[in-house]
Every structure is written in structure tokens, then in C-alpha cells.
Amino acid sequence: INNKGEKMTNLKKIGLTALAGTLAATTFANAGSMSVSGNAIMEYQTTEVDGGSNSVNTTDGFVLNSSLVFSGSGELDNGMTVSVFQNLFAGAVTSEGLSLDMGDSGVLHMNRWGYTSGITSIADKIPTAGENVHDDLNNATGENHDNPAVGIAKTQSDGADNLGYNYSGEMFSLSAATAEVNGAFESSVALTVNAMEGLSIGYGAGNDRPSVALDNDVTTMFATYTMGPVSVGYQVTEIDHQTASSDIDADHYGISFAVNENLSISYGENTVDFETSTSDEESSGFSASYTAGSMSFVLVNNEKLNAEGTATDDNEMVELKMIMAF
């Protein structure tokens, strides 16, 4: 009886079974874990916008801001660690990222809206107990309150897929990022030096492409110092606009004080000089936060005068938030 074909079939089955077992063993040996965390935020916010000529618009309302973060990590055979996360707000992805931790060689990652690399990672280093002084305040032309058009050291690539690299040492940390925006590349670097105990100084530089025709230079410098319960910070940001006489310079400082292990308060000011305007935009803000376990209460009062350099275009925001982390 010729059973050569049957033997070959059995050998194939044995080979496939062995291969499947090997792959399964490899997969489970290197399998990581996934977890879900998040926060539930209930807040009440009131905003008053004065556009001049007795044009005052006041809005009040309750706001629900809750998010979920799906994250996972696993160790490779070579000892490196792969991590992934995805942040969801109202069912939509607001940020996501993938990183490869190479130990002493640093971390290579790709992010979208992660604010983790390049100049964006040091865009605002001023200490605060709640929010930055420019948060949730309108601008004359409807610009976002935290991009280069209003003096903040962030680039248009924040919404694109960024390839980044971070290195952290005992004396300094280095961060770099690049992404394709409007048909060309945006790139930036940031360096932070731990000059002495409690004192950090940093510098960042990069380019911003708000449109196909524009390529602006962005630089920022900061210094922060912490001694006991007090932290102070000062930061200068410059936007060298490709269009003549359109540069933007911003000066930002702030101080925070930890009253005790639960209660902190802060105050800050930010002045933005628009070369195209005769009026400076002036923002100031007070924040207070109280934390008890996984629950926090935050009070913020921010005010902006001459929004985006437009005289008499003023607005103010007050909000009270209850944050529950889980």
C-alpha cells in the first residue's frame, strides 16, 4: 500500500503544530498587560467677554470633563520595554502614543497630541496649583489659547504624528521631535539642566509651519526654583515670524506655595507683545487646589486684557472643579 502522501500530510500537521506551539510560547512569554485608568471631572465655569463699546457677553454653565486612559506595556527579549497608551474623551481619541524604552540609551516614541517631546515638552514650565494663566480665555480672532500665534512655544505638529526621543540623566535631560506638517518638516529640541538642588534651567528651539507658505522660528527659555513649599518660575518665548514686523514675544512668571500636604495656591502673570499691535496682551491668574486621597477640588480665576493685542478686548474666567481619579 502506498501511504507516502498520508505520511507527508501527517508530517506537515506535526510541523505546523510545533510551529504554532513555538509562536504561542513566544507570544505568552513576551506578553504585557493592559490597564484602564481615568478621571471624572465635574466643573462649573463662568466666562465674561468684553469686546469694547459696552459689548459684554457672559456665559455660565456646568461642564462634564471625564476621560479614560488605556495603557499597556511589555518587556522584550533584549530587556527593552514597549509601552502604548490611548486617551479617550467623550468617545474620541485625544492623544495616543507608542514608546520604546531603551534603558540608559533613552526613550524612542511616536505620539499624537502627547506634548511629550521637543520644544512642546517645555512650552509652559511656570508652577501653578491649578491652570496656566492663559487657559480657557478667548482671543480677538478666535485663536487657540495655547499655540505660537499667541506666544506659546508649541508647534502645529502637535496634532500630527510626532517622532520623538527623550533622554534623562542626573544632570540634564534632552528631548527632540520631528513631524511632517503642511508638506514640510517641523523639528525642535529642548534641553533642561539641573543646575543645583531645586534649580532647573532650560532652552528650546524649533520651527513652526502654520501654513504651506510660512516657516517661523520658535525659541523659549525658562528657569524654575523650588525651596521648601515655595516654587517660582520665569519663562521667555519668542516667535520670529517669517512675515516682516509680525514677531511675538511673551514673558511669563509665577509662584506657587504649598500651604500643607493637601492645600496649594498660586499666582501668575503673562505679557505678550505683538509687533503688529500697539497694545500688549496681559493675562493674570490665581489658582487654589485641595487634595484628599483620589479627590481634588480646584478653583481658578484667570483674566486677560487686550486679547491678542486688541485694545479693550478683555475677558475673565472663573471655574470650580471636582476631580476624581480612578
Predicted regions and their residues:
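Outer-membrane beta-barrel proteins
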Residues: 1-326
